[in-house]
Amino acid sequence: IFVPGILICQFYMFIRGKGHRRKQRKRAVGVVTGILSVSLFMSGCGAAVEPEKRMYPMALGVDASEEGICLTYGMPDLSESTGQGKEEEDGGSRVLQISGADFTRIEKMYDQSQEKLLDMGHLQVLVMGRTLVEDGRWRMVLDYLKQEIFVGEDLYVFEAEDAGEILNWHGEDNSSAGEYITGLIRNRMSGGNITAVTLRELFYEKYKEDKILRLPIVKIRNGSLEVEV
């Protein structure tokens, strides 16, 4: 508010100096009051939500379900995603699953049942269930993510028999599926051993050919996550 306040004062002095009639002064006071009110309102609207009041999914799984679709949100270690040095109290599951008829319904159910703001800006991995890929509902998934302005298009996309199962996996060091897959892909890419598929590439292929690219397969084998290309 400090900088806008200075500008408002300067603006007021300018208007005051331009005329000496009472009507002009009243008009200037009205304009300044309006600007100050808007500044105060905008500063309130722009207040940031504290990190501990946000949920930061690093991975998102999308499966077919009896209701329609099932979203699985996979969170990393809170201390890493927020820098607060706070760990999950139970040291266990950091996964949330919600099923609904469509994405709009699922978002509404999330808002009604969760106290934390959903922050999709940290999403790095998307896992789509095989049923959605085969029956064409992958288009619905891409359309949903396209309108999510905070979702980055450089996230990695995979296919799995059961996306929810993948996101419920935890490593021996309690690492989440999102953390493990991201690290694995980046290590392989740095060595030139893998070519990942990104959300940006899927968007391009969808709007160019209305097709989906062949996705790397992620699966659990003997308790370990494996990625097949």
Label every model-predicted segment.
Residues 20:
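Glycine-rich phosphate/adenylate-binding loop
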